[in-house]
Amino acid sequence: MKKKIESYQGAAGGWGAVKSVANAVRKQMDIRQDVIAMFDMNKPEGFDCPGCAWPDPKHSASFDICENGAKAIAWEVTDKQVNASFFAQNTVQSLLTWGDHELEAAGRLTQPLKYDAVSDCYKPLSWQQAFDEIGARLQSYSDPNQVEFYTSGRTSNEAAFLYQLFAREYGSNNFPDCSNMCHEPTSVGLAASIGVGKGTVLLEDFEKCDLVICIGHNPGTNHPRMLTSLRALVKRGAKMIAINPLQERGLERFTAPQNPFEMLTNSETQLASAYYNVRIGGDMALLKGMMRLLIERDDAASAAGRPSLLDDEFIQTHTVGFDELRRDVLNSEWKDIERISGLSQTQIAELADAYAAAERTIICYGMGITQHEHGTQNVQQLVNLLLMKGNIGKPGAGICPLRGHSNVQGDRTVGITEKPSVEFLARLGERYGFTPPHVPGHAAIASMQAICTGQARALICMGGNFALAMPDREASAVPLTQLDLAVHVATKLNRSHLLTARHSYILPVLGRSEIDMQKSGAQAVTVEDSMSMIHASRGVLKPAGVMLKSECAVVAGIAQATLPQSVVAWEYLVEDYDRIRNDIEAVLPEFADYNQRIRHPGGFHLINAAAERRWMTPSGKANFITSKGLLEDPSSAFNSKLVMATVRSHDQYNTTIYGMDDRYRGVFGQRDVVFMSAKQAKICRVKNGERVNLIALTPDGKRSSRRMDRLKVVIYPMADRSLVTYFPESNHMLTLDNHDPLSGIPGYKSIPVELEPSN
C-alpha cells in the first residue's frame, strides 16, 4: 500500500468512483455470484443499501447505487469468514494489536461465539446455549437498569421494535443509540422548534426549490446519491451554496457515473455557485450575522414603504418568539461575528442576499452542525433562518437533516429512545398486557458513564462499535472489561468485541442483502430514510453461513431465555414479520395499514405535521428559539487558537474503515494525518508532510494528557484556526463531559488543541 499525499484533480464521482467500486468488488466479493446483487439494491423488490439514509427516487436507474454503497455491500457479502479456526489461531490479546480496518476485513462472523478467558480466545457454542447463558446472567441482576441496550442504525424497524419490547418487559428504558452521537440535536432541537424531530422535506422538494444551502456536511463521501439531486437542481437553474470549513469535492463539482455523455467526455457539473469556509465552531455566528442583515434590511424596506423582506404573515400566524430573537440578533456585534465565523461582513451579506432573493429554500445539514456542545442550538438557528421567510411547510422549502445509517431514524420512530412518551408506553402496555417502565433511561453518554462508575453490569449491542465510537476510549476501555456481561450482535469483528467482559458473546446475524428465511417463508424488513419514507427491504443472496440468524430471531431467543413467563409470543412473531408489523401498527397509529402499504413500490410516507404547518409544540406554533451568545462550544470560550474537528475519510462509513485512502482530499494509504490551511501552517511554522503533535486542552485552556503524536501535516484549502483529523482515531481527544447539555451529543467537531512539532 503506497503512502502519498497528492492533490486529486477529478470531480466527485466519475471514473475515480468506478475504479474504486471495481477495486472493492475485486477484493471482497465472489464476482460470479454476488455482483448481480448490486442490481437489486435500492429497488422495490430488492434490499435497501446498508449505507446512508438518502431516499430512493421514484424512478430509479437500473443500477441505483453509489460508490460508498457499493463498498458497503462488497464489505457485507465478502466470501471471507471469521470462524472457529480463525479464533483458534488468534487470541484476543493478539487481535487487539490489529488495526480497525484489518479486524473487519477478516470477514463475516458465521457462528455464535463465547469468550474463554483461559485460552484468551472466542470459542463456538450452540445458539440455545448462548441464549440460555445470556438469559441466566440477565435474570441474576437485582435491577434491570444495570443493563444497557445499545442500538445501531443498521437495525431494521422490526428488530428494533422487538428489541425495545424485550428491554421494556425486562424493565429498562436504557437505550443508548448511535443517533445520540450524530443527530440527537436534530431530534431534540427540531422537536422544540417545530414539534417534529425530523426533517420536513421530500425528495420532490428538490425539484421545486430555488436555493439549497448545504452546511456542515460532505455528500461526496457520506451520502453520494445526493449528488444526483444536487446536479439536477443546478441543471434546471436553481442554486446551491456550500458552507463548510473544508473544500469538499462533492460540494464543488460532480461527474455522474450513470451519465454516458459526462463519463465519455470527462465533463462535469459545477454544483456550488458559492463556497464559504466558515471556521470550525463558527456556524452560529454566521447564522446570526445572516439574520441580523435580513432584519435590518427588512426594517429599511418597511421604513421606505417597500415590500417586506420577511414573511410577516407567516411569522404572525404561525410562530412565537420572533421579538426576542430580533433583540438577540441585533445585539450581536459584527466584530465578534467576523472573528468567530472567520468570514467578513461582506461575505455574510452575499449569503443573506442569496437567501433573501430565493422564494423557496431548503437547508441541508449534517454533523458539522450537530456535533458541538451547542449542537441543538445550532439546529435551532437554522430553523430560525427558515422561519423568517416562511420556508417551513411549503413546497420546495424546509429543513433537511442528513442522517447517517440507513435506518437510524426508523429505530427511533419504533421506540428506541431513553425518554419514551407516555402515550407510546400506554399503547405498548395495552397491546401486550404489561406495565412498561416510565423512568427515563440512559442515552449514550449516560450509558458509558454508568459503565465507568460501575453502575452498569451488562451491555447488549445490537450492532455497531460502541467502544470505538464513544469519546475518551482510554478511560472507558478498562471499565468495559469489568462488566459482568457483554453481548454483541454483529456481522463482522470489531474492537468493541475485544474488550471482553466476564461473560462475552458474539452473536452473528444476517446482512441486509441476505435471504431471511423463517417458518412462513422469506421475510422482508422495513427501514425509514431521512425523509420519513418507509419501504421494504428483501435480501436476495444466500446467507454467508448456515448458522446465521436474523436480528429478530436473536432478540426473540434472548427474550425467551430471559423472560420464561413473558407475555409476548416471541416465536409466533418471528415466524412471520407481518405479525411484528401488525403490532407496530397497533402501538403507533401512523403506521396504519403497514403491511399493505409496504407492498407498494417505494413504500409510504409518515406524515410530518410541521410540513403541513401543524405545530405539535406546547405553544401550538413554531418557535423562534434564541441562543445567547455566538459560541457553539463553551469549552473554546478561552479563545483557543486552534480547534480540531473529527471527520470520516472517503474509504470509511462511521467506524467501518473500508480502506486507507481519502481520495477526494488527496490522501492515500494512510490515516495518521492532520489537515490545515496554508495560512495556518505558516502561523504554526510547519510545512506540508512534516510531523506534529496535537495536545487536547482543558476548558480553562491548559494542556491535558490526551494527545495525538506524529501526525503528518496535509495543507488543504480550508478555514484558518481549524484542524481536521480522522474519526474514530481522534475520539480520545475529548472526554465524556464534552457534550451538549440539551441533547447529550459529544462535541466531536470542536476540540480545542495545541500544536507542537514532533521530535
From Swiss-Prot:
GO molecular function annotations of the record = 4 iron, 4 sulfur cluster binding; formate dehydrogenase (NAD+) activity; molybdenum ion binding
- Coiled-coil residues are none
Entry cofactors = [4Fe-4S] cluster; Mo-bis(molybdopterin guanine dinucleotide)
Give UniProt keywords alphabetically.
4Fe-4S, Iron, Iron-sulfur, Metal-binding, Molybdenum, Oxidoreductase
Q: What's noted on cofactor binding?
A: Binds 1 [4Fe-4S] cluster. Binds 1 molybdenum-bis(molybdopterin guanine dinucleotide) (Mo-bis-MGD) cofactor per subunit.
Signal peptide position in this chain?
A: none
User: Could you tell me which cysteines form disulfide bridges?
Assistant: none
What CDD domains does the record tag this protein with? MopB_CT_ydeP, MopB_ydeP
Instruction: Please state, per the UniProt record, what induces or represses the expression of this protein.
Output: By EvgA.
Q: Any idea what job this protein has?
A: Probably involved in acid resistance.
Tell me the protein's name.
Protein YdeP
